[in-house]
Amino acid sequence: VFAVDAGRQMCEPVAGLPRIDRAVSAMLLTAWVALKLGDRVALHAFDSRPRIASGVVSGMPAFANLQRLAAAIEYSGEETNYTFALTTLAARLTRRSMIVLFTEFTDLTSADFMVRAAARIVGTHLLLVVVLRDEELERIADATPATADDVTRAVTAAALLRDRKLVLTRLQHLGVHVIEAEHDRVGERLVAGYVDLKRRNLL
């Protein structure tokens, strides 16, 4: 089950494209592989509330319908409601499933809601969270400062990256699988992660 966060943070650009566009591309690639391997697939999209719910599909002919649904995911300026979205999604599932959550967080408050929502479902379902590396923040944190403003920016960037790592570590401690990938490698990383989890028979 692919759960795509379409909230405000996912509409921010990474290397010229909104995060959500990169997430949808990775989702479609992995969905194609899953259908090819004979698995059943569903697509959900949400922001402050659920927006799209495909139901479970199987077989390669279903891929075209997933593409149409993915194209209908709209950019949203609303904050993501993880609790509502993931609780609603979990209630629709009648068996243990792999949930692939594409999301983004920039503050500890929203991240805490995500972690709490994840904790509620990770005992029942296999949860894989996919985020894009913030390469711009990494560049700022690693750059040699030339001015006082550069120092301030570097310190701020380093603090944000520490917070980010803390959140991802909390998720992993809950038993959530995490992929943090470069924007141009997220599709291949997700396919590899999906195939690995399937090979390990964790479902």
Please identify what each model-predicted range represents.
Residues 1-203:
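Exposed, interaction-prone extracellular/peripheral surfaces
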